[in-house]
Amino acid sequence: MALEFTLNHLAAASAAVDCLVVGAYADHTLTAAAQALDAASGGRLAALAQRGDLSGKTGATTLLHDLPGVTAPRVLVVGLGEAARFGVPQYLKAVGDAVRALKAGAVRSALFTLSEVAVKDRDAAWAIRQAVIAADHAAYRYTATLGKKKADDAGLAQLAIAGDDAQALAQGQAIAAGVEFARELGNLPPNYCTPAYLAEVGVKFAGEHDGAEAEILDEHQMEALGMGSLLAVARGSANRPRLVVLKWNNGGDAKPYVLVGKGITFDTGGVNLKTQGGIEEMKYDMCGGANVIGTFVAAVKAKLPLNLVVVVPAVENAIDGNAYRPSDVITSMSGKTIEVGNTDAEGRLILCDALTYAQRFEPAALVDVATLTGACMVALGHQTAGLMSKHDDLANELLAAGEQVFDRAWRLPLWDEYQPMLDSTFADVYNIGGRWAGAITAGCFLSRFAEGQRWAHLDIAGVASDEGKRGMATGRPVGLLSQWLLDQAARA
């Protein structure tokens, strides 16, 4: 159940909610709202802090009941850590800590006052917007396939944010909706979230919002366009491919921003079958597609004054007697031929045709997003996405957007010196580059299909989902991409 968000202008002590959320630092210093409650209660918070019953350490939460002079029956004190080190990551963690502490139980409504706490190099609008996004992320529950285990609706349902910037609140709600949309798609099992399902979801959303439209290409239409690379990957699956094209038209005659997202709804590896574990997590191989759709949802709900096109090649990489093989030579939509060195390097084979298709929209910028390589995860871990581009201005825009919302990317080189690693004797290009620099050679491969474009590639293999049996889709980098689009709209 998604949280409902409002703004609050009243003093915390008189707010009629089930719980107030305030903060304390490691040295027992209280935030302004906490100081007001302390004064109203006759110094109760300060006394608790001094005797060690109220911790200001990062991650600590203390729930207090029935403070005198305070209307709300509960006060949640969230530890903020050292005041001198309090910044963006600490603020976002505090939001999540608060919501997780109230996620289940008797509290239905709360007032979050930490949005009034100063965060270095960030303004009040940022604090409100990011509080909404982080709170909604922490409150997310997956219930689609739980059946008899379906979670109940108990727990926090309404969160008032201290502040008065209605636009920031609305933008936060829009981006939070996009993140949640992407996470839900990513978390669905592959027998639910097929290429056809992704297409249906896109059509349904576009049909519900003025200014949005959807076009779905089936395999026959893709064949007519010459998408031999994408269709080769699709050959082994009973779930037939789709090309999902979503358009948001709110920027007049301006050129659109185009996002392309890898939509491999399940990846067996093909003939090069995955044998080293982790195959059960390959439903997340469509998170690039899910996340660009989520970004589309955010842009539409925020009514951003720009034109946006999202292209998702939705394909399942499976195995049957018709599956493509290592050493096959396939012809892409661009006319370039590709020698298949490994059928488990399939993401780039569907993206190359999608990138060629996307150029018909004459993009102001073209960005592809993909869980493309394990090599990127080895290099950068789960903390950051990999970014590759030959366009410094575009790369810097994306990097800055990621830093702004703590959904970060790290730039990797895309030098011409790597390109010979993709040489083939039998085709124009080989689809793998060998043992070394795997994330970079994958980016180099894609760059051959984005020539003449202001293009960037985001490898999100390390950030798209959490690891392990209880891991879930994260929705990254919807935050980065949405902030980038907000920045572009502000400059228009």
From Swiss-Prot:
Q: What class of enzyme is it?
A: hydrolase
Supply the name of the protein.
Probable cytosol aminopeptidase
**Catalysed reaction, written as an equation:** Release of an N-terminal amino acid, Xaa-|-Yaa-, in which Xaa is preferably Leu, but may be other amino acids including Pro although not Arg or Lys, and Yaa may be Pro. Amino acid amides and methyl esters are also readily hydrolyzed, but rates on arylamides are exceedingly low; Release of an N-terminal amino acid, preferentially leucine, but not glutamic or aspartic acids
Among CDD domains, the record links this protein to:
Peptidase_M17
Record's GO cellular component terms: cytoplasm
Q: Which cofactors, by name?
A: Mn(2+)
Protein keywords: Aminopeptidase, Cytoplasm, Hydrolase, Manganese, Metal-binding, Protease
Q: Which organism is it from?
A: Stenotrophomonas maltophilia (strain R551-3)
Q: What does this protein's record comment on cofactor binding?
A: Binds 2 manganese ions per subunit.
One GO biological process term: proteolysis
Q: Which HAMAP family match?
A: Cytosol_peptidase_M17
Subcellular location per the Swiss-Prot or TrEMBL entry: Cytoplasm
* Disulphide-bridged cysteine pairs: none
EC number(s) per UniProt?
3.4.11.1, 3.4.11.10
Q: Where does Mn(2+) 2 bind?
A: 262, 267, 285, 346
